[in-house]
Structures are given as C-alpha cells and as structure tokens.
Amino acid sequence: VMEIIGEISADIVAPNAEGVDHEGPKVVDNHVVYAPGTAQNIEVMAKAGLFGLTLPRKYGGLNFPLLYFVMANEMVARADAGFENIWGLQDCAETLNEFASEEQKEKYLTRVCQGETCAMDLTEPDAGSDLQAVMLKAHWDEARGTWLLNGVKRFITNGDGHISLVLAR
C-alpha cells in the first residue's frame, strides 16, 4: 500500500501540482469545482482505496495504524502540499470513528472511504483556534430532525468538503 501511495504521489500528484497551482479551483453555480489535476488526484486515490487509510474495514477502510497514515501523508505532501491538505483531512473521520454513533459511522465513514472529502470547521473570529474559547452553539431541532448552528466560523479548512467536522458547544 505504501508503495502504491508513493507511485501515485510521484506519477500523478506531483506532475499535476504546477497546473493545479496555476489553474486553482473555480466557483460554478455556487459550488467549488476543483482544478482538473486535483479532481484526477482524488479520483485516482479513491480508486486505489487510499481514503480511509486508518478506518475499520467494515466501513471500507484499510484499518492501518496511524503511523502509516502519517508516512503516507508525508509522501503526498512532498508531491503537492495543497493536495495533501485535501487528502489528509480524511483524518477528520478519526473523530467520527471515535465518538459517533454506529448509525453516523455507517453514514459518514463509508463515504470518506469512497473518496468524499472532509472539511474542518474550527476557527472563529474571536477565538482563533483556541478550542476552549469556541462560541458557536449547536442545538438539536426535533421538528426538523437536524442540528442547528448559531455563530460564526472562518478559515474553514477545505470548506468545500463533502463532510464537515464542526466544533460547537
């Protein structure tokens, strides 16, 4: 697996890096569309089964120890640090794997393992990244069957990700 990550990083991700930097993502119909090179990187990594590296097999992951994810992440970062920021955020799923209900794990972890990207919503205007100073409030709306958020986030890491890990009180 590490050899495959190295090959994909060297043969696909690295050659795409310069073009991705020049072209960048675009907003189309209020949605972020990755540069073609980034989209190709995601597709190739997903087809190779390299999302969900540390997640349990029952969700489609490889069940690797974190050390292997860190090593793989370094290989991807060497090829393209910008893409590493997208691919590496699969680590958000570790929080779900640790704390989510089984229903939530089935819903979200399988999607990460299939190549859907994650976003990390932590930073706030008056708190920065001081996690204890977070003011965003969350409450469950029984009538709608969903969580409602009240507050402000900024500098969302990979804000266009399919699955967001939001820090709230």
Region locations from a protein language model:
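Amphipathic, small/basic residue-rich leader segments at the start of a protein or domain
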Residues: 1-83, 103, 107
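Internal maturation/activation junctions in enzymes
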Residues: 25, 88-89, 100-141, 145
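Short, surface-exposed charged micro-motifs
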Residues: 42, 135-139, 155
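Short, flexible loop/turn elements at secondary-structure junctions
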Residues: 49, 59, 124-126, 142, ...
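Structural motif
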Residues: 50-53, 117-119, 146-147, 164-165
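Core alpha/beta catalytic barrel or barrel-like domain that forms the active/cofactor pocket
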Residues: 52, 56-57, 79-95, 114-124
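Flexible loop/turn segments at secondary-structure boundaries
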Residues: 59-63, 92-95, 104, 126-130, ...
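A short core secondary-structure module
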Residues: 146, 150-169
